[in-house]
Design a protein with these regions (language model features):
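Short, Lys/Arg-rich flexible segments
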Residues: 1-84, 90-94, 98-143
Length: 143
């Protein structure tokens, strides 16, 4: 799965530190809220580039779009919470890995120009994702 790393603003990190013992129960909710925003932006960007500006008619089956997903928020051995948003490890009906299709669209190949959709999803969705995460966090801090 593709890896996206975002640095969080200092005021957001201060709010997180106020949670104390509740942090481990709130962190997955906060990460999933931000992940949903990025996933939505990825779907939008992917739909806008698949089959556009090609020499031949598109033969898209929708397998790549269907493989987009989000892992549950999990804590690693260092105690850090992570969530992954992107293309899964599955293959289409012909055995072609969807990650390969995503890479070819993102970076292009000989005779096929790049159509970046993943990187732009991260940059376009970043502010919305952080706002969504803040909203969930504030909802958890108030009660």
């Amino acid at each position: 799965m593709a890896k996206v790393t975002m640095k969080l603003p200092d005021d957001f990190l201060k709010d997180l530190s106020r949670l104390g013992d509740k942090f481990d129960s709130v962190a997955p909710k906060v990460l999933e809220a931000g992940g949903k925003v990025i996933l939505s932006q990825m779907r939008t960007n992917l739909a806008s580039v698949v089959g556009k500006d090609t020499k031949y008619e598109s033969r898209s089956t929708g397998d790549l779009e269907n493989s987009l997903g989000m892992t549950p928020a999990l804590q690693d051995r260092n105690g850090e919470w992570n969530i992954r948003v992107g293309v899964g490890d599955d293959k289409d009906s012909k055995g072609v890995p969807n990650a390969l299709k995503a890479q070819l669209l993102e970076y292009g190949k000989s005779g096929q120009p790049a159509k970046p959709w993943m990187k732009s999803a991260r940059s376009k969705g970043r502010k919305k994702a952080i706002a969504s995460m803040k909203q969930v966090l504030e909802g958890e801090l108030l009660p």
